[in-house]
Design a protein with these regions (language model features):
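Divalent metal-dependent hydrolysis catalytic cores, especially in the metallo-beta-lactamase
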Residues: 48-74, 85-94, 147-160, 188, ...
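Active-site core of metal-dependent hydrolases
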Residues: 42, 98, 152-234
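Active-site mouth loops of central-metabolism enzymes
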Residues: 34-47, 114-137, 188-190
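Histidine-rich, glycine-flanked metal-binding segment
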Residues: 1-18, 37
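Metal-cofactor-binding active-site regions of metalloenzymes
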Residues: 30-33, 84-125
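Metal-associated gating/positioning segment near the N- to mid-region
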Residues: 15-80, 98-108, 173, 205
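Alpha/beta enzyme core
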Residues: 127, 136-152, 158
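Acidic (Asp/Glu)-rich catalytic clusters
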Residues: 78-82, 143, 222-228
Length: 234
């Protein structure tokens, strides 16, 4: 190999050089279990997130797609040269229906629309929105905060306490509202969904990316292809 003039030669010590790796699904701003979020100072959580960001870069991941949580500030700190980490595409707040996969209130906490101020939601991790109008507002709020794409909870999950994993979350009308608001910003909606019904409901509303999808069948996979959508299986 002939080195071009002015090229910087780095002694790799016999190691293999590869291009930077892209991580398709992370939650870098949620570095501790969700049940610890409420009782942990936000500055401490951010410090842990910055440590995680540096570790990700040092292990070879140069770009990450962050799929929910207040990572937009971490992304800006890295972009502005104040912290070390990968390029981050943030989703900002998870968007969830009441009793959806992103409704992490304690059992006896009142609903935010009833005047309650949840400690979890003060930390900007997620937002509860019901009905097309509230969903539109929630998407626009995440975009205002700096989201590159929008993350909506479209079905049940493992880490949430009050929704069955086989539940379908959001009506098509609500999901279409999210898609419309995202498309007006020249971006897209990605959804958390495991099951056929949840994935199909999202696809029919115009969602472009399915996150997880571990319980879907071949017919649903074919529908993803027909809709020219994408499946991120992490």
């Amino acid at each position: 190999i002939v080195n071009p003039d002015g090229a910087k030669v780095i002694n790799g010590g016999g190691l293999i050089l590869i291009p930077g790796i892209i991580e398709a699904h992370t939650h870098i701003a949620v570095p501790i279990p969700k049940n610890k979020i409420n009782e942990t100072d936000q500055a401490y959580i951010t410090a842990l997130s910055l440590k995680v960001a540096k570790g990700i870069l040092m292990r070879g991941w140069t770009t990450i797609r962050d799929m929910g949580g207040p990572s937009q500030g971490i992304a800006k700190a890295i972009d502005d040269g104040h912290a070390v980490g990968p390029r981050i595409y943030p989703s900002a707040k998870f968007i969830s229906q009441t009793s959806g996969h992103g409704d992490f209130r304690d059992y006896n906490e009142d609903h935010p629309s009833m005047g309650a101020i949840s400690n979890y939601y003060q930390k900007q991790s997620s937002i509860i929105a019901d009905g097309p109008a509230e969903v539109l507002r929630a998407v626009r709020e995440s975009l205002r905060l700096g989201a590159s794409q929008i993350k909506v909870m479209a079905g049940g999950g493992i880490s949430s306490d009050y929704d069955p994993i086989d539940s379908v979350q959001y009506t098509k009308e609500e999901m279409r509202a999210a898609v419309t608001a995202a498309e007006q910003w020249n971006t897209y909606v990605a959804v958390h969904a495991y099951t056929d019904d949840a994935v199909r409901n999202a696809l029919e509303a115009g969602v472009k990316v399915i996150e997880h999808g571990h319980l879907i069948n071949k017919d649903t996979l074919r529908l993803i292809k027909r809709k020219k959508a994408y499946l991120s299986t992490q």
